From Swiss-Prot:
Residues 1-16 form a transit peptide. It comes from Bos taurus (Bovine). Its EC number is 2.3.1.16, 2.3.1.9, 3.1.2.-, 3.1.2.1. Its main location: mitochondrion. CoA binds at R224, T227, S251. Disulfide bonds: none annotated. The active site is at C92, C382. This is 3-ketoacyl-CoA thiolase, mitochondrial.
Length: 397
């Protein structure tokens, strides 16, 4: 929808994204969301006392205290105990949804300032044993379940997420070569942007423990900028014989968090905040679960229609790179301009910590739009189960 009130982003930060089992593996989703939230509050000069609501997205609920996640984030960063909090889950769209939910609170005048965010520790996803709470028979073989792996299959259609991407490859005639070439581009674009310092304004450095002692993590850990086409071509398809999806052209399993603080126009004036961007509108759509990766197509189209804008108006476009064939299917369907889409690399390079990605994409668009002097940008993601979500922002510089 197009917003009923002026809603502005006054701070947007994210942690570096950690590789699976990497530097962030010992931090809970709550820890990482706290790091991002503290950085956002500081960057936006937002006093915790002015925050009216906390909305944090999280998918896997991987820590023992995850049921308290958003509440604990708020309390840890000094937001008053009287301020409510909610943890939400729209799978891969949860980071975006936190912003959408925050906008809805502001538009309904339930809140004036909202701390939004998304966080995920895929490294901490637990193993579990089901159906033993009420006893087991002698000799029973207990099945240990990897919740991370099983969660990547949509049981309603009995289909792993990667197969939904393979379905799009067939439908849109996308080749393995196309996918590997796009994956290489994602890695190369990330390296160029990172070397130029384009991620600096969005980054919330994290102090981590290593064998060499404590160090400050300021750079994403997952990217492999030295990747070559030859290396990508040698990787075997993961889910389908002669398929297109490999470990090299799919988004990386990773850890990370982001925080975006939004405020009404009245709050911006009252607290003398510096608006970085205006939230123009958003749209959420369902789609066929067997091709869930096409979700950004109806989501972006819907957001543009609701706001009276077109793709030509967009200076930057971000489509979360769940899988290379998924992204390429969206690019084909919308006839996206590659020169302004995922300009600094995406999840194939950076990793895709589920709920963290929407917050990362939003934070990146805010700062990159300002760096380039552009006006409009749209961020989007496909969502497991068959949905898509998109948010349009406008540069206020």
């Amino acid at each position: 929808m197009a917003l009923l009130r002026g809603v502005f982003i006054v701070a947007a930060k994210r942690t570096p994204f950690g590789a699976y089992g990497g530097l962030l593996k010992d931090f809970t989703p709550t820890d990482m969301a706290e790091f991002a939230a503290r950085a956002a509050l500081s960057a936006g000069r937002v006093s915790p006392e002015t925050v009216d609501s906390v909305v944090v997205g999280n998918v896997m609920q991987s820590s023992s205290d995850a049921i308290y996640l958003a509440r604990h984030v708020g309390l840890r960063v000094g937001i008053p105990k009287e301020t409510p909090a909610i943890t939400i889950n729209r799978l891969c769209g949860s980071g975006f949804q936190s912003i959408v939910s925050g906008c809805q609170e502001i538009c309904s005048r339930d809140s004036e300032v909202v701390l939004c965010g998304g966080t995920e520790s895929m490294s901490q996803a637990p193993y579990c044993v089901r159906n033993i709470r009420f006893g087991t028979k002698l000799g029973s073989e207990l099945k240990l379940e990897d919740t991370l792996w099983t969660g990547l299959t949509d049981t309603h259609v009995q289909m792993p997420m990667a197969i939904t991407a393979e379905n799009l490859a067939v439908k849109h005639q996308i080749s393995r070569e196309d996918c590997d070439r796009y994956a290489l581009q994602s890695q190369q674009r990330w390296k160029t942007a990172n070397d130029a310092g384009y991620f600096d304004n969005e980054m919330a450095p994290v102090e981590v423990k290593t064998r060499k002692g404590k160090q400050t993590m300021q750079v994403d850990e997952h990217p492999r900028p030295q990747t070559t086409m030859e290396q990508l071509n040698k990787l075997p398809p993961v889910f389908k014989k002669e398929g297109t999806v490999t470990a090299g052209n799919a988004s990386g399993v990773s850890d990370g968090a982001g925080a975006v603080i939004i405020a009404s126009e009245d709050a911006v004036k009252k607290h003398n905040f510096t608006p970085l961007a205006r939230i123009v509108g958003y749209f959420v759509s369902g789609c066929d679960p067997t091709i869930m990766g096409i979700g950004p197509v109806p989501a972006i189209s819907g957001a543009l229609k609701k706001t009276g804008l077109s793709l030509k108006d967009m200076d930057l476009v971000e489509v979360n790179e769940a899988f290379a064939p998924q992204y390429l299917a969206v690019e084909k369907s919308l006839n996206l301009d590659p020169s302004k889409t995922n300009v600094n690399g995406g999840a194939i390079a950076l990793g895709h910590p589920l709920a963290g990605s929407g917050s990362r994409i939003t934070a990146h668009l805010v700062h990159e739009l300002r760096r380039r002097g552009g006006k409009y940008a749209v961020g989007s993601a496909c969502i497991g189960g068959g949905q898509g979500i998109a948010v349009i922002i406008e540069n206020t510089a």
